[in-house]
């Protein structure tokens, strides 16, 4: 099997799968999911399916048999549980090594750009995985994917009903279209190369929280106000006032994300994405405006705590 796409029921993985369906013979790739119940969803479209669960080494060993290129989508485990992420990723790397996978394409995060200096907990988990890959002897490419522009409500903790937003800090973020990231990731895999390298895919412009609020107001006619509060006040008030029922740990994580943005960790941009697309990526301001024109109440699934 030339290509195995993990996370095929998710956002990024799903878009990558659609690119493969449109561009590659069906016999050359397979989709995988942690839920065997998804088999019919793919096979009804003629797509090969393999059950693969990051928590279950048996499924990993079986699914990775004869795979040449593995798209290793980082786990969707709660980003607050860094140790769980590391454990699951270690399972994948070990199984890929045992299966002699020829090339692992890993989706990482862009905190710190192309450096390894970020102290943000979610990025430390990715850095640990990148280190595992380097030490495994596998051929790999770590793709640091830009922050999804579609998820901007999560960074602001903005709901359609919100009239007053509070944040602990502000900073520039190179928010990037998830659809464009998927296209570029798929093209990287298909064209090959970039062996044992870390690459960065981002939009060519940045945007701040203050500017995001302006776009919300300009596009939807709302009058959302943004105030800056201390990190302690933000964390204390967040769980009490949150419509989505998110935990205190979420707001602690959000503080660290905005502190990293304020220090410049998310403003690094790279020209590789434009090179792969053959044009400039959609700027974050335009992307947010487009999302809100399509749905003035645009939201993001992680805004609501899982029950």
Curated annotation (Swiss-Prot):
Which BP terms from GO are recorded? Answer: terpenoid biosynthetic process
Q: What does this protein do?
A: NmrA-like family domain-containing oxidoreductase; part of the gene cluster that mediates the biosynthesis of flavunoidine, an alkaloidal terpenoid with a tetracyclic cage-like core connected to dimethylcadaverine via a C-N bond and acylated with 5,5-dimethyl-L-pipecolate. The tetracyclic core is synthesized by the terpene cyclase flvE and the cytochrome P450 monooxygenase flvD.
Keywords, comma-separated and alphabetical: NADP, Oxidoreductase
Provide the E.C. number(s) assigned to this enzyme: 1.-.-.-
Q: Name the enzyme group at the top EC level.
A: oxidoreductase
Q: What does the record give as its pathway?
A: Secondary metabolite biosynthesis; terpenoid biosynthesis
Question: Which residues does the record give as NADP(+) binding sites?
Answer: 4-9, 32-36, 53-54, 74-76, 148-151
Q: Which family does it belong to?
A: Belongs to the NmrA-type oxidoreductase family.
Coiled-coil positions are none
Q: Which gene encodes it?
A: flvB
| UniProt protein name | NmrA-like family domain-containing oxidoreductase flvB
What is the organism field in this record?
A: Aspergillus flavus (strain ATCC 200026 / FGSC A1120 / IAM 13836 / NRRL 3357 / JCM 12722 / SRRC 167)
Q: Name one GO molecular function term.
A: oxidoreductase activity
Q: Which superkingdom does the taxonomy of this entry point to?
A: Eukaryota
> What catalytic activity does the UniProt entry give for this protein?
(2S)-5,5-dimethyl-2,3,4,5-tetrahydropyridine-2,6-dicarboxylate + NADPH + 2 H(+) = (6S)-3,3-dimethylpiperidine-2,6-dicarboxylate + NADP(+); (2S)-5,5-dimethyl-2,3,4,5-tetrahydropyridine-2,6-dicarboxylate + NADH + 2 H(+) = (6S)-3,3-dimethylpiperidine-2,6-dicarboxylate + NAD(+)
Q: Name one Pfam family in it.
A: NmrA
